[in-house]
Structure formats: C-alpha cells, structure tokens
Amino acid sequence: SVKSEVDNFDKHLKAESAPFNNE
C-alpha cells in the first residue's frame, strides 16, 4: 500500500540521515 511505501521511505530517510545527525 502507499502508506507502507511512505513508511519504508521515511525509515530509509531517517536511517540515512542518522549518521549525519550524530556527527
């Protein structure tokens, strides 16, 4: 569903930005 796709996209986005935020 679109909801799950958006959730997955958001999770990937947070996972990718986490290292940058931690520095």
Curated annotation (Swiss-Prot):
Transport found in the keyword field: yes
Keywords, in A-Z order: Lipid transport, Lipid-binding, Secreted, Transport
Subcellular compartments: Secreted
Tissue expression remark: Expressed in hemolymph.
Basic and acidic residues: compositionally biased ranges: 1-15
Principal location listed in the UniProt entry: secreted
GO cellular component: extracellular space
Region (Disordered): 1-23
GO BP annotation list: lipid transport
Function according to Swiss-Prot or TrEMBL: Constitutes the major component of lipophorin, which mediates transport for various types of lipids in hemolymph. Acts by forming lipoprotein particles that bind lipoproteins and lipids.
Protein name: Apolipophorin-1
